[in-house]
């Protein structure tokens, strides 16, 4: 499987302070992990559920 490039991006909470539970793909660990999204900006490596993260980034 050729990974999408956004799956390699680090978790990016962004500058806002909402602390919304979200998931990102941890490229080094090769798995989806929880992080807290601030609610604005950030990057494309952010998913509302672990299942969506796995579908996008896990082989």
Curated annotation (Swiss-Prot):
The UniProt keywords, alphabetically, are: Disulfide bond, Ion channel impairing toxin, Potassium channel impairing toxin, Protease inhibitor, Secreted, Serine protease inhibitor, Toxin, Voltage-gated potassium channel impairing toxin
Q: Which residues does the UniProt record annotate as the domain BPTI/Kunitz inhibitor?
A: 7-57
A Pfam family of the record is Kunitz_BPTI
PROSITE patterns noted in UniProt: BPTI_KUNITZ_1, BPTI_KUNITZ_2
Disulphide connectivity of cysteines: 7-57, 16-40, 32-53
The family annotation for this protein states: Belongs to the venom Kunitz-type family.
Under which name does UniProt file this protein?
Kunitz-type serine protease inhibitor dendrotoxin DaE1
């Amino acid at each position: 499987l050729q990974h999408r490039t956004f799956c390699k991006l680090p978790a990016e909470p962004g500058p806002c302070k909402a602390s919304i539970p979200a998931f990102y793909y941890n490229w080094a660990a090769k798995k989806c992990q929880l992080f807290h999204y601030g609610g604005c900006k950030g990057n494309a490596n952010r998913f509302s559920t672990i299942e969506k993260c796995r579908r996008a980034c896990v082989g």
